């Protein structure tokens, strides 16, 4: 890390590999709701065998992806 004395055995989380089923369910939920209540996050976490934190972060990342995909084109460059 930035401080130079990071050793590999410290608790750096490994990347979560979601199953097709988990992604399908998360995408389905995102289609109806871009934001989750805590209760709904808990329900999804239990149903998909993931942690609340994983659900929360997946939704944060998915919202950023959605935002990038739906960005309005830059109108300054267009000439009449």
UniProtKB/Swiss-Prot annotation:
Pfam families: Homeodomain
A GO CC annotation given for this chain: nucleoplasm
DNA-binding region: 21-80
Cysteine pairings via disulfide bonds: none
Annotated compartments: Nucleus
Gene Ontology molecular function: DNA-binding transcription factor activity, RNA polymerase II-specific; RNA polymerase II cis-regulatory region sequence-specific DNA binding
Biological process according to GO: anterior/posterior pattern specification; positive regulation of transcription by RNA polymerase II
Keywords: Developmental protein, DNA-binding, Homeobox, Nucleus, Transcription, Transcription regulation
Xref: InterPro entries: Antp_homeobox_Deformed_sf, HD, HD_metazoa, Homeobox_CS, Homeodomain-like_sf
The protein's role, per its UniProt record: Sequence-specific transcription factor which is part of a developmental regulatory system that provides cells with specific positional identities on the anterior-posterior axis.
Family: Belongs to the Antp homeobox family. Deformed subfamily.
Protein's recorded name: Homeobox protein Hox-A4
Organism whose genome encodes this protein: Lineus sanguineus
Gene: HOXA4
């Amino acid at each position: 890390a930035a401080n130079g004395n990071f050793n590999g055995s410290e608790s750096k989380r490994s990347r979560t590999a979601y199953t097709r089923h988990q992604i399908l369910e998360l995408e389905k939920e995102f289609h109806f709701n871009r934001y989750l209540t805590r209760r709904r996050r808990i329900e999804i976490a239990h149903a998909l065998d993931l942690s609340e934190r994983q659900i929360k972060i997946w939704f944060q990342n998915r919202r950023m992806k959605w935002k990038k995909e739906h960005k309005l084109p830059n109108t300054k460059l267009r000439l009449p």
